[in-house]
Curated annotation (Swiss-Prot):
It is found in: Secreted. The lineage of its organism: Eukaryota, Metazoa, Chordata, Craniata, Vertebrata. Induction: Produced in the A cells of the islets of Langerhans in response to a drop in blood sugar concentration. One of its GO terms (biological process) is negative regulation of apoptotic process. One of its GO terms (molecular function) is glucagon receptor binding. Glucagon plays a key role in glucose metabolism and homeostasis. Regulates blood glucose by increasing gluconeogenesis and decreasing glycolysis. Transmembrane segments: none annotated. The keyword Signal does not apply. It comes from Polypterus senegalus. GO terms for cellular component: extracellular space. Keywords: Hormone, Secreted. InterPro entries: Glucagon, Glucagon_GIP_secretin_VIP. This is Glucagon. SMART domains: GLUCA.
Amino acid sequence: HSQGTFTNDYTKYQDSRRAQDFVQWLMSN
């Protein structure tokens, strides 16, 4: 991910339970 793509993805997921899964996915890659 570029910084912009990361920011957009985080914004989409931050208000969802998927935010936690998204962070874990980032950490595992």
